[in-house]
Amino acid sequence: MRPSPSLASHARTCSSPPSSGSRITATRTAFRISLDKLGLDYLDLWLVHQPFNDYYGSWRAMEELVDAGLVRAIGVSNFYPDRYYDLVCHNRVVPAVNQLRLNPYDQRRDTREISARYGTVLQAWSPLGQGGAVLKDPVLVSIAREHGKSVPQVILRWLVQTGVSVVVKSVHEDRLRENIDIFDFALTHAQIDAINALDRRETGNGGPDHRDPAMLDFLRTFE
């Protein structure tokens, strides 16, 4: 038995042959390579990186890996509500996780609603807005001052307290410790409402919009 912590990885959906059969085979091969490199006998979580190319073929191969006990859970990343719902409707296993950009300025309420309906956990990447204007927002600064915490801690607490898992990147030990130190306080309902009101619906999110034909043409250059 492997001890904690749990390990997750992404299954890329670029750089692959176009047919479903080829995609299923390519996914199986990619999984074995990842497992060998990690020196493990199973993964806790494996994600489809983006809704592009034959991600249905990838998903069905991943379902087989779950059945075989080689992956404990499978999920998706960067899936908008329409792509997420389509995947749920036409496949056997519901994604355990949908990992996407989510922060006070980009709250993805439509995705949160449909994910909750099917029991998929939302996991926020870039929850601190990549250190941008959100960290200087006066509402967040005021709430942080009330609790004697930093703005990043308030944002992370808001996400966790409202049921969102978080992925926070840092190479500094002091910041890593700060990011973990969010369980000794709780936001009030009024404070949560104030943060919810900051949503700017910035769904362009600084990453690929897989509904944009121009972006899909760009992604094809990596195949």
Role assignments for model-derived ranges:
Residues 50-223:
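Beta/alpha (TIM)-barrel catalytic core signal, keyed to glycine-rich beta->alpha loops juxtaposed to Asp/Glu
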Residues 12-24, 44-51, 78, 102:
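A short, structured active-site edge motif that brings together acidic residues
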Residues 11, 40-41, 92-93:
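Active-site acidic short loop of glycosyltransferases
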